[in-house]
Amino acid sequence: MNGHNTYSDAFRHSLWNALICIHVGGTKSSRIEWAEKFTTLHETSSGSYDANGLETNMDLHNNMIGRNWYDKNATQSNYWIFYSVSSPSDEQAANAIYNLAKNSVYCTNVSSIKSNSTKLVHIK
């Protein structure tokens, strides 16, 4: 699996976000929030950033899919003022997101990216 803006790029972005959530500390929601802030800043601070661009929207969308996968597959137990987060393993994340990438949707415009809210997308 390789190639810029292909389903391999979708896999990479999504897995990157899931792994950040798995490995950063904090509550489940703070992990997701931190991953979103960090990866969105990464995407939007580049010199080639275009808020309406196909590539930018693809990357931000696939980042979100990785965070959503983590949200559905991690659990948090609260004990009085303490909490415990149980995250999936790196291997579980990689396998699940690989399966999502194999079914990635080819998109030719931003509206088609947005209409595939639960699927990984690629533009090449």
Model-derived features with residue positions:
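Intrinsically disordered, low-complexity, mixed-charge
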Residues: 1-124
